[in-house]
A protein has these predicted regions:
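Short amphipathic alpha-helical segments
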Residues: 25-29, 41, 51, 67, ...
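Cytoplasmic-side transmembrane-helix entry/capping segments in multi-pass membrane proteins
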Residues: 45-46, 83-88, 270-275
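Active-site-flanking structural segment that lines cofactor/substrate pockets
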Residues: 39-66
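Selected transmembrane alpha-helices and immediately adjacent juxtamembrane segments
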Residues: 1-31, 38, 111-212, 273-295
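Interfacial loop-to-transmembrane junctions
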Residues: 36, 260-279
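Membrane-interfacial helix-loop connectors
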Residues: 58-114, 192-263
């Protein structure tokens, strides 16, 4: 019981730290949705399939809010699948500030960010251009109608039909996601505390050549603790750099959790989750092959 209460408290505090940024993110979404419909239309009319570039750049910012925004926009079909994946793969959550605090790893951080951004853009373009004809139309994303039809959420009005302030809608969505993320954080915290970080390190070390595959799986956990764990294991020498890259590529912060909450198609969500994991694992294994051949 003591262990449960400790993890419960830590999960609550860690998740609560996300609330201000999540609220601002949702407030931005509501503001854009209600006040800038024409600008959205003009932006989308300019060619949304190139969105992988700004998506990857925004993903570099160590904040979970951008992946949450991307998930909401994809659920509303405002952005393409390629843009969504670019944001996910470029996101590094808490790994960046953690590595920034260690001057000895600044060179590795620079290499990490370059690899992630380039790879995120490449995957995004592959999905939006090369594989566009193969993917089902409902999965491609991207909005081609009129901006006044873009609705990331529902109409914000009371029973009398009066418009509600955007902050109320933003607050409600923030609290809904808070509960969802808190549940994930609690379960993950109990697993880590119950099994132990050493067990995770031993498991990753025993995987050998396929370590990136497992690291990519760990990265899928929608909690900043996952990116912190991967970074700490790398710093401690239990994780190879290729595995760190794989794990941080799949570490889209709360993006996947928000996607599962907002996108109604569980099949699409499952495919995107698997695609995120596969993209990270493939990159990690490919890096290991290159190192093995040329090192």
């Amino acid at each position: 019981m003591e262990l449960f209460l400790d993890v419960l408290g830590e999960s609550l505090v860690d998740t609560a730290k996300m609330l201000p940024f999540l609220f601002l993110a949702y407030l931005l979404i509501e503001y854009i949705e209600t006040r800038h419909g024409e600008r959205i239309e003009a932006l989308l009319a300019g060619g949304g399939r190139w969105g992988a570039i700004p998506g990857a750049v925004l993903g570099c910012v160590p904040q979970c809010g951008f992946s949450a925004i991307a998930s909401n926009f994809y659920s509303s079909r405002v952005i393409t699948l390629g843009t969504l994946m670019a944001v996910y793969l470029a996101t590094s959550d808490e790994a960046i500030p953690l590595l920034v605090s260690m001057p000895a790893y600044w060179d590795k951080l620079a290499v990490l960010m370059v690899i992630k951004v380039v790879y995120a853009i490449a995957v995004g373009f592959a999905l939006d251009f090369v594989l566009r004809g193969v993917l089902p139309k409902s999965l491609r994303g991207g909005y081609t109608g009129h901006a006044d039809e873009v609705d990331c959420h529902e109409e914000h009005s009371d029973e009398a039909g009066n418009a509600q302030p955007i902050w109320k809608a933003a607050l409600r969505h923030t609290l809904e996601i808070f509960v969802f993320i808190f549940a994930f954080s609690l379960v993950f915290g109990l697993i880590v505390e119950g099994v132990g970080e050493d067990v995770f390190a031993d498991l990753l070390g025993s995987m050998g050549f396929f370590q990136p595959v497992v690291a990519a799986l760990v990265g899928l956990i929608p909690n900043c603790a996952a990116s912190v764990l991967l970074t700490q294991l790398y710093v401690e020498g239990a994780l190879r750099f290729s595995s760190l890259v794989a794990g941080l590529c799949t570490g889209a912060g709360v993006g996947l959790a928000v996607l599962w909450r907002t996108n109604p198609s569980w099949k699409q969500n499952l495919f995107i989750t698997g695609l995120t994991w596969g993209a990270g694992a493939v990159l990690g294994v490919a890096m290991q092959v290159v190192v093995a051949v040329f090192a």
